[in-house]
From Swiss-Prot:
This is Large ribosomal subunit protein uL10. One of its GO terms (molecular function) is rRNA binding. Keywords: Ribonucleoprotein, Ribosomal protein, RNA-binding, rRNA-binding. The gene is rplJ. It comes from Bacillus cereus. It comes from the Bacteria. Under acid-stress, this protein is expressed at a higher level in wild-type B.cereus than in the acid-sensitive mutant strain NB1. The keyword RNA-binding applies. Forms part of the ribosomal stalk, playing a central role in the interaction of the ribosome with GTP-bound translation factors. The lineage of its organism: Bacteria, Bacillati, Bacillota, Bacilli, Bacillales. Belongs to the universal ribosomal protein uL10 family.
Length: 21
């Protein structure tokens, strides 16, 4: 479960970074 949350957080961070750029 912890890994799933970590992966989701990573994806969210990636999307946020793309939106900023």
């Amino acid at each position: 479960m912890s890994k799933v949350i970590e992966t989701k957080q990573q994806v969210v961070t990636e999307i946020a970074d793309k939106l900023r750029a």
